[in-house]
């Protein structure tokens, strides 16, 4: 009698080759070399080799380098041989730890306490990879990200970018120039604001502004008593962005392009309530963020256009160059 082919009886032609991998628990430095043809097989061997109790299953496999969760077989097959995995039980979370060269292990109890520092350790690497893919993304970075890359030792950043230390020193110098330019722009805006304030006082406009602010304050109080609290709860901005908006002069120069876009999309009234501002100030800051975002995107687009133009004009390797025209004899 012929047996029907099911999930337990794979086609011999579909048998996948074994992939060598390295396994470890997230609280141990000991790692084991295993070979598996699928994620399910790797999970099974992880439970067996690492003595993970069945009560702690299902386990999650993450890349030891950056904590990426691996739950897709096709992605698993694309990984190189001897990829390092960390096996996480159901009550554990991955966190970056640089003390052992980038391998991660942490128990659930210590996860919350160590989270900020570890995230910062991973964040600069993610920003560095972004620059590696497209150098023009420097324009889109926040001041915090720019400073983080400047503070990283040259050797570490060079290793992450696969560049020489001399090249990375030039890059860090460029990053510092971008920071300096934003600071100069901030100081210029502050001076302009002071000048405008002086003009307002001389022109006796201040009294009119007080009346306007009083009216806006009454409007804001009405919002607070009714819809205001609901709007404040609807603000989706991170607390770090709100702090930057409230405390930094010319905050649009400190934010990343992604943060600028988030601020631009917020409801002005909700933003005003969240920051305890009048609506006019919230709208002014939103407009500044929108303008700064458009400027950065335009700069990136210009860089890409110049790059494409340069690539079209440069002959490909092996491509014959056009012969230059001979100069006419003036005699």
Curated annotation (Swiss-Prot):
Residues with PTM Phosphothreonine: 243
PTM text: Caspase-3 cleaves DFF45 at 2 sites to generate an active factor.
Entry keywords, A to Z: Acetylation, Apoptosis, Cytoplasm, Phosphoprotein
UniProt keyword Manganese, yes or no: no
Keyword Transmembrane attributed: no
Protein location: Cytoplasm
Gene3D superfamilies: 3.10.20.10, C-terminal domain of DFF45/ICAD (DFF-C domain)
Site (Cleavage): 117-118, 224-225
Region (Disordered): 306-331
Molecular functions (GO terms): deoxyribonuclease inhibitor activity; protein domain specific binding; protein folding chaperone
Any Pfam family the entry gives: CIDE-N
Family annotation (InterPro entries): CIDE-N_dom, DFF-C, DFF45, DNA_fragmentation_mid_dom
Taxonomy, superkingdom: Eukaryota
GO biological process, alphabetically ordered: apoptotic DNA fragmentation; chaperone-mediated protein folding; negative regulation of apoptotic DNA fragmentation; negative regulation of execution phase of apoptosis; positive regulation of apoptotic process; thymocyte apoptotic process
GO cellular component terms, A-Z: chromatin; cytosol; nucleus; plasma membrane; protein-containing complex
Primary localisation category: cytoplasm
Subunit structure: Heterodimer of DFFA and DFFB.
Name by which UniProt lists this protein: DNA fragmentation factor subunit alpha
Species: Mus musculus (Mouse)
Gene of this entry: Dffa
């Amino acid at each position: 009698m012929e047996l029907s082919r099911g999930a337990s009886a794979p086609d011999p032609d579909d048998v996948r080759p074994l992939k060598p991998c390295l396994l470890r628990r997230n609280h141990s430095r000991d790692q084991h070399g295993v070979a598996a043809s699928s994620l399910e097989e790797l999970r099974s061997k992880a439970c067996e080799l690492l003595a993970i109790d069945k009560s702690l299953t299902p386990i999650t496999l993450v890349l030891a380098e950056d904590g990426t969760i691996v739950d897709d077989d096709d992605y698993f097959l694309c990984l190189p041989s001897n990829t390092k995995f960390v096996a996480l039980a159901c009550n554990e979370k991955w966190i970056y730890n640089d003390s052992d060269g980038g391998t991660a292990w942490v128990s659930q109890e210590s996860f919350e306490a160590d989270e900020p520092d570890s995230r910062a350790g991973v964040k600069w690497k993610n920003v560095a990879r972004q620059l590696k893919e497209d150098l023009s993304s420097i324009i889109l970075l926040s001041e915090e990200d720019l400073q983080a890359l400047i503070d990283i030792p040259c050797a570490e950043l060079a290793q992450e970018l696969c560049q020489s230390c001399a090249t990375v020193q030039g890059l860090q110098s460029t990053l510092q120039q971008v920071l300096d330019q934003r600071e100069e722009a901030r100081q210029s805006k502050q001076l302009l604001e002071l000048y405008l304030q002086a003009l307002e006082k001389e022109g006796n406009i201040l009294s009119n502004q007080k009346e306007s602010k009083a009216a806006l304050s009454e409007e804001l109080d009405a919002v607070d008593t009714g819809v205001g609290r609901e709007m404040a709860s609807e603000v989706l901005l991170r607390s770090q962005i709100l702090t930057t908006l409230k405390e930094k002069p010319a905050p649009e120069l400190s934010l990343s392009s992604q943060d600028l876009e988030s601020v631009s999309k917020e409801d002005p009234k909700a933003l005003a309530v969240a920051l305890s501002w009048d609506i006019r100030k919230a709208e002014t800051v939103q407009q500044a963020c929108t303008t700064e975002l458009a400027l950065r995107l335009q700069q990136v687009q210009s860089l890409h256009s110049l790059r494409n133009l340069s690539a079209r004009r440069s002959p490909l390797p092996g491509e014959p160059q056009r012969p230059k025209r001979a100069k006419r004899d003036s005699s």
